[in-house]
């Protein structure tokens, strides 16, 4: 909203023209979301404690998790609020991409909120029935996929960028809708599965969002896009503000979520953030790159698939417990060691993903 005010004030003082620069607004967006999260965090935690909205811990999980029982959850509300405030202040609300991101964050956040509410407030350990959760996720993702396909005006908006191959960018046609759907829903559930240890999910999310901020900026700049042989997407520049808002809100949340956590994000945070990363990947045409940079999320998801598949087919488990971060806990690794090592892996994969922009 302040973009429009600054545009109006430019006629009185040219200094306000600085607000037209995406990079300047991106920095302000990051700082706004960060300060908002740090300021509102203690208030939200106290409120959640008063309402007795505490984490439900599985009885068959690692014994070290029993001490987490009752820790305030649904802290993802803090992240989403920080992102929304930041984007509404510094983003261009006429941008199709910004509106899509607000819809994704809001819709998947609502699904996660319903799930958390049933688990924590109504004491239903199953939460939202898996079938209904998947149906609601699918509807939201399909709305986004169909809208983006039907409103696309440039060939690059429906091409697939293949890392390491600069001349391989097939036009997807209707396959775009299928790929966008699976990317958004898959990323949403992958981050949700990763959110099992203090700070484990939020830091990789911050890293990937930061990398996508750079990619969105490059995609929105015609000279950089042509140099790197990626689609030039004029609207992608505004995604930088969304990405930096996620980074700022995520870092602010990590202040309270780092080991030992004072609050957990809950499904309201993990489902929304995962879907947001998936949607950003779709918008900048980097779905495959998300698989690389979000490798920790992929690893967690694959471990669950392998565990369930092996048990059903052979009656044997591959890991001591899935997702895989619990496997290492049961092997005797202290929780902070698991978390930091997964962070290091995530940083490596994000840097590898960024390197593919040039290694083509």
From Swiss-Prot:
Enzymatic reactions: UDP-N-acetyl-alpha-D-muramoyl-L-alanyl-gamma-D-glutamyl-meso-2,6-diaminopimeloyl-D-alanyl-D-alanine + di-trans,octa-cis-undecaprenyl phosphate = di-trans,octa-cis-undecaprenyl diphospho-N-acetyl-alpha-D-muramoyl-L-alanyl-D-glutamyl-meso-2,6-diaminopimeloyl-D-alanyl-D-alanine + UMP
Enzymatic class: transferase
Superkingdom of this protein's organism: Bacteria
Pfam families: Glycos_transf_4, MraY_sig1
CDD domains the UniProt entry points to: GT_MraY
GO cellular component: plasma membrane
An example Gene Ontology molecular-function term: metal ion binding
InterPro entries: Glycosyl_transferase_4, PNAcMuramoyl-5peptid_Trfase, PNAcMuramoyl-5peptid_Trfase_CS
Ranges annotated as spanning the membrane: 18-38, 73-93, 97-117, 134-154, 168-188, 199-219, 236-256, 263-283, 288-308, 338-358
Membrane topology: Multi-pass membrane protein
Location relative to the cell: Cell inner membrane
Pathway terms, separated by semicolons: Cell wall biogenesis; peptidoglycan biosynthesis
Single biological process term from Gene Ontology: cell wall organization
Enzyme Commission number(s): 2.7.8.13
PROSITE patterns: MRAY_1, MRAY_2
Function comment: Catalyzes the initial step of the lipid cycle reactions in the biosynthesis of the cell wall peptidoglycan: transfers peptidoglycan precursor phospho-MurNAc-pentapeptide from UDP-MurNAc-pentapeptide onto the lipid carrier undecaprenyl phosphate, yielding undecaprenyl-pyrophosphoryl-MurNAc-pentapeptide, known as lipid I.
Similarity comment: Belongs to the glycosyltransferase 4 family. MraY subfamily.
HAMAP family (UniProt xref): MraY
Protein's recorded name: Phospho-N-acetylmuramoyl-pentapeptide-transferase
């Amino acid at each position: 909203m302040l973009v429009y005010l600054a545009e109006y004030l430019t006629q009185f003082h040219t200094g306000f023209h600085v607000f037209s620069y995406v990079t300047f607004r991106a920095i302000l967006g990051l700082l706004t979301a960060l300060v908002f999260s740090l300021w509102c965090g203690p208030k939200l935690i106290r409120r959640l404690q008063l309402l007795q909205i505490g984490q439900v811990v599985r009885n068959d999980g690692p014994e070290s998790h029993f001490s987490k029982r009752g820790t305030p959850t649904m802290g993802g509300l803090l992240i989403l609020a920080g992102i929304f405030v930041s984007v509404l202040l510094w983003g261009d609300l006429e941008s199709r991409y910004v509106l899509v991101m607000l819809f994704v964050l809001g819709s998947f956040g609502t699904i996660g909120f319903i799930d958390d509410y049933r688990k924590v407030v109504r004491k239903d350990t199953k939460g939202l029935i898996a079938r209904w959760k998947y149906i609601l996720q699918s509807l939201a993702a399909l709305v986004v996929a169909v809208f983006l396909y039907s409103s696309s005006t440039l060939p690059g908006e429906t091409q697939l960028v293949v890392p390491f191959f600069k001349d391989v960018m097939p036009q997807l046609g209707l396959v775009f809708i299928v790929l966008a759907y699976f990317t958004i829903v898959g990323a949403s559930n992958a981050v949700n599965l990763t959110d099992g240890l203090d700070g484990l999910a939020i830091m990789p999310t911050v890293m990937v969002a930061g990398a996508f901020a750079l990619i969105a900026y490059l995609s929105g700049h015609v000279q950089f896009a042509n140099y790197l042989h990626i689609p030039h997407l004029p609207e992608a520049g505004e995604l930088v503000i969304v990405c930096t808002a996620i980074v700022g809100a995520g870092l602010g949340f990590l202040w309270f979520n780092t080991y030992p956590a004072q609050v957990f994000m809950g499904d309201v945070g993990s489902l929304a953030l995962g879907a947001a990363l998936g949607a950003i990947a779709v918008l900048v045409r980097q779905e495959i790159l998300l698989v690389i940079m979000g490798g920790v999320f992929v690893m967690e998801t694959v471990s669950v698939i392998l565990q369930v598949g092996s048990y059903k087919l052979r009656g044997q488990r591959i890991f001591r417990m899935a997702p895989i971060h619990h496997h290492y806990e049961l092997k005797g690794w202290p929780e902070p060691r698991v978390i930091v090592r997964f962070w290091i892996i995530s940083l490596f994969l994000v840097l590898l993903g960024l390197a593919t922009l040039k290694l083509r």
